Amino acid sequence: GRGGFVRRVAMIKEERKRNPDLLYFDSGDFSQGSAYYTMFKGDVEIGLMNLMGLDAVTIGNHEFDFGLENMARLFRMANFPIVCANYDFTGTVCEDVVKPYVVLHRNGLKIGVFGLSPKMKGLVADKNCEGVKYLDPIATARKTAEVLKKKEKCDVVICVSHMGWADGKEYDANVIQGSRYIDLVLGGHTHTYMKHLEYVKDLDGHDVPVDQNGKHAIYVGRIVMNLK
């Protein structure tokens, strides 16, 4: 990005000083974009992300670029959770390193965070995702958000998504329209820069905010949630 990782790390540290309850997420495709990734296959990116103190990330299609073995290796290096509810990694090397969701705690509140990722066909070489099952993101979001709200008793439910923002099936808007209990969607994949939050109504008619911050780590989004 324009500011570079060093400035980003410094900025996040300053933000955490001002607000110790800050949550920081990444919506995927963090493994690609520079010659460093081509040379070191993600070690540099994961090392720098570890310095930023991420609370959770989801999986983008470019995380598969060097195959499942490399993806699992990188995820084990990460000191933050990898969440994706609609990829079934059962029987693969990633089975034990990817969770459908995590529950975070801040200032007495429980925040449930789950991830959604796009259909691999057409985006990922078959040999790089062999054995991974793609689950319907809308049905998965509906089920996972309900688990977080009802079973885990979360005060807030956040979806960190790499589905994308555009007209068409299985994008963020469709996920929201087919689910309930999601309070915020943090998007990626389509490189959309939103100057302001977009809102989509869920199954119960509630307006759910969506944010996406462009591409290449040029921008960092900042959202303040007021819980009533």
Features from the language model and the residues they span:
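Acidic, metal/ion-coordinating pockets
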Residues: 1-228
